[in-house]
Amino acid sequence: MRGHDRINNCLPEELILEIFRRLESKPNRDACSLVCKRWLSLERFSRTTLRIGASFSPDDFISLLSRRFLYITSIHVDERISVSLPSLSPSPKRKRGRDSSSPSSSKRKKLTDKTHSGAENVESSSLTDTGLTALANGFPRIENLSLIWCPNVSSVGLCSLAQKCTSLKSLDLQGCYVGDQGLAAVGKFCKQLEELNLRFCEGLTDVGVIDLVVGCSKSLKSIGVAASAKITDLSLEAVGSHCKLLEVLYLDSEYIHDKGLIAVAQGCHRLKNLKLQCVSVTDVAFAAVGELCTSLERLALYSFQHFTDKGMRAIGKGSKKLKDLTLSDCYFVSCKGLEAIAHGCKELERVEINGCHNIGTRGIEAIGKSCPRLKELALLYCQRIGNSALQEIGKGCKSLEILHLVDCSGIGDIAMCSIAKGCRNLKKLHIRRCYEIGNKGIISIGKHCKSLTELSLRFCDKVGNKALIAIGKGCSLQQLNVSGCNQISDAGITAIARGCPQLTHLDISVLQNIGDMPLAELGEGCPMLKDLVLSHCHHITDNGLNHLVQKCKLLETCHMVYCPGITSAGVATVVSSCPHIKKVLIEKWKVTERTTRRAGSVISYLCMDL
């Protein structure tokens, strides 16, 4: 009977709350909260996480949220993310006039004036100590708090937060100009703190860090510091002396030397994850790390000027549990150092070599011979690595699932055939500007790697239609990027459309020989397509788009700049036919006023003024 909701009235509140708990995405929870007023009132009890971007008057916004959501344990404030507000100006067309002196008009005028004055004041769109105090009062049970680039938060607000939110376990202050007093308060009151991020906190010194470390010594497990000139070895010495449970350490600083890292190695024997960009640290410190940090599982080193094969040998000798190794721009590490790691750390599962110009074929061969558990390999800007390196990977690393190759001019089809035949569990293959890789290697991948779901072949000039035909026959791809592969034409993309019905992401930008026919095939064969990049495709027209969107109703993003065959009619077709569309990248002159009114929020314009 109309007006009577018999089923909903019989549902207990516990069951409705359980429904909300099982909904993972925020849009789904929002949709279910609109079932009725009862569901809307109950939905707030299921929320445990809030994410807030830069918006007008965030201090007031925090107060409003605290009154609605009562069980929040995680709050993420990121002021790098802007939140656009709906326009408060009156609509130009009105069916019924209103007196400008009416109460509602007066309220609207005040709100508009307040908005415009706030736009002139930078602080109005930034969280301040007042808002942080409101957050502390409204969410005293919070456990995880991220304040990313909140420049108007100071020690005053942080002190208030620390006193109220004593259950805090994770605190991220990246880019906040807080001082030592606030950090000391966190150390005094937040005795359960486990994770702390102090990246780009320029107002901090050793004094505040030491106070926090001493106060949270029994709980602290993770510390991150970057670009803080006044945080030195003294802070690390305190960490080594007090934080016996420390497992994760991220350091990016030219003011940290061997003394500080040695102190950490001597005191923090549970250290598992070490990520460093410290130009002043030398092999001496890594000798201590290798000898004392026997639980180390992840090591990432960036732009080291005094780290050599000697340090690598120390790690290989002592850190037998190492599973993840990243070396980026470490110019003084050679094949000998990587061989020492391979021989000593046989549990390696992931290796990334980026711009280390002295590492060549022999180092990667050693990984292939000694590390059978390897699952991911990334070789970026490695000009001295040749085919035989990946031949050894194919022979010895049968569990390899992910392979990244960027600007590796010495790797060609011989290497890819070896990978295809030996690493049949390969799931992701990303190749960019490897000009010796062509059809033969990719055909072999399609023939042998049946589990492949992601394939990226960007600017690989020798890859053509035959390669994609083999992939379409052998693999059920979900993501494909062939941007800049100029030998690929309609036949290759058609083969993918017919052979990969699970495809969700496709990038065919900068392909000069692609026309409308593949888009029609994609519409018929790939109904799950969500992301499409067509930019710089000169032969695609509105007709192709029309065929595509008739069946691809899940499309969320479409990039189509520099496509002369696409007009304002094609843009209108995309935004009107795809109910889930979130972003369309196009030249501004191709968007009509009607399309702007209908879907202005999803249109992104190519910047032409650069």
Swiss-Prot record:
Alphabetical list of Pfam families matching this protein: F-box-like (PF12937), LRR_6 (PF13516)
Residues forming the F-box domain are 5-52
Which domain of life, per UniProt? Eukaryota
Q: Which UniProt keywords apply?
A: Leucine-rich repeat, Repeat
Placement of LRR repeats on the sequence = 53-79, 124-149, 150-175, 178-200, 201-227, 228-253, 256-277, 278-303, 304-329, 330-355, 356-381, 382-407, 408-433, 434-459, 460-484, 485-510, 511-536, 537-562, 563-588
Q: Where is this region: Disordered?
A: 88-125
A biological process from GO: response to UV-C
User: Gene3D superfamilies per the record?
Assistant: 1.20.1280.50, Ribonuclease Inhibitor
The identity of this protein, by name, is: F-box/LRR-repeat protein 4
Origin species, per record, is Arabidopsis thaliana (Mouse-ear cress)
**What lineage is this protein's organism placed in?**
Eukaryota, Viridiplantae, Streptophyta, Embryophyta, Tracheophyta
Name of the gene:
FBL4
